[in-house]
Amino acid sequence: MRRQDLETLFGFSYWMKDRVLECAAKLTTAEFQAPSGLTTRDLRGTLVHTLDVESSWRARLQGQPEDVWKKELPLGDYPTARALIDHWRRDEYQMKAWLATLDDDRLAQIYDLEPGSAERFPLWYYVLHIHSHTQQQLGDAAVLLTRMRQSPGNIEFLEYADFLHREGTRPEGHARVRAGRQHLGSDRKST
């Protein structure tokens, strides 16, 4: 997998995260912390866990000491979504900066997560794992928000692509789509 592809996927995750946090910020503290009988964690727990996993996996893959990436973010530090937003923006900046340092050859190298372990994969497997975990958790958060009447709306990849097109931007390294392209429109079927 190429770095520019991973940067696009992480751009999508951060766009999705922003939609989810924007809705979560409209909740009262009690709503944000309300127990969930639907998912493994409540909304706050889901979002803090998501940030924690992104941050700790990045630190681990960067070779930081175990005491840095092993500790968990305390839920009590994030009583509201607003408290979480600033931390996540800083982490997003750090993640994007780290991704920018990885070239395609580095991503293809086998990464020995635990020396001596049989589980050895290219670095891009682990980076993609961070992205897919975030997608799953943000999907859970979106379900919880929807049940609280604060739906983030459609947060699928093509919605992100349409957003970029409307903004006149595109993921780094991707050619602009020619004006004569076929338009699928908003009648796409969601899966």
Residue ranges and their predicted role:
Residues 1:
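An N-terminal RHG(E/S)-centered segment typical of histidine phosphatases
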Residues 7-22, 26-74, 114-177:
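Short, contiguous alpha-helical
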Residues 65-105:
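Helix-adjacent hinge/juxtasegments
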Residues 101-116:
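Acidic catalytic patch
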Residues 178-184:
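A late-sequence structural motif
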Residues 190-191:
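Conserved small/polar residues in nucleotide/adenosyl-binding loops
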